[in-house]
Structures are given as C-alpha cells and as structure tokens.
C-alpha cells in the first residue's frame, strides 16, 4: 500500500498574539470545509404554507360599511385553501411563490391516437424504403446518361 492515501492535514495551533488580536478586533472566521459539510436544519412545513399561526395572521380593519370583515376574510382564505387542494388532487400543484414546477409528462398509451395522420413506425419505415428504391432507380438512370457526357477516360484509352 502506498502511504499517499494515509496523508492528512493537521491545522497547527494559532499563536497567542493572533488569537488576542482577533478577539480585540472582533474577527469571526469564515466557513470552512467542515462547516459546509454540516447538515442544515430542515425548515418547518408551516413556514412554507404561509402564516398559519393566529399571531401571524393579518389584522382586519373595517373603516367603512363596505369593507371586508374578518369573517369574509376567513371565508376567502378557506376557498383559496380548497382550490389549492383540488388543484393538487388534479395533479397540477402550482406554487404560490410563482415558481415554475417541472414534472415528467404523462406517458401516452399506444392505443390512444391523437392525430389521424400519424402512422405506425413500421409503416413509416416501409414507405421510406419504397421511396429510397424509387429514387435509387432514377439516380442510376441519370448516372448512365452523365457517364456518356464526360468521356475523359475514353480519350486516354484511344492514345
């Protein structure tokens, strides 16, 4: 075994004068490789859904007779939640942040034909093959005509 794999870096102890100077200045050390490898704490699911706690709810103030009341605001909020739940059940969850969510398209069954002009791959291969045969017979006829037009080889043979 080579000893190269067993090499590791050991950070030397910081001198006393540097540690005193950093303490006086208020220096904080930046992120290291070890701090970047640490797992971040997971965010609560409540924070993603908005402010659900009562103390975080918006305050409703009615100044005029036609203003929105607290009860009406709660009804609207319930309608929005129901609409989000129904859209998630439909398979199209939309983000409230406005972020675009990418998802794999649903696979189509071979039985379901979307367009009447679409044919199977076997038919397409057969038609391409017949087209090639037709064009190849035409191209050989053109090559015969063109060979008589250019007769450089014939002149060399005559000499």
UniProtKB/Swiss-Prot annotation:
It holds the Pfam family DUF4604. Residues 135-150 have a biased composition (Polar residues). Residues 45-57 have a biased composition (Acidic residues). Residues 23-68, 80-159 are annotated as: Disordered. This is Uncharacterized protein KIAA1143 homolog. The lineage of its organism: Eukaryota, Metazoa, Chordata, Craniata, Vertebrata.
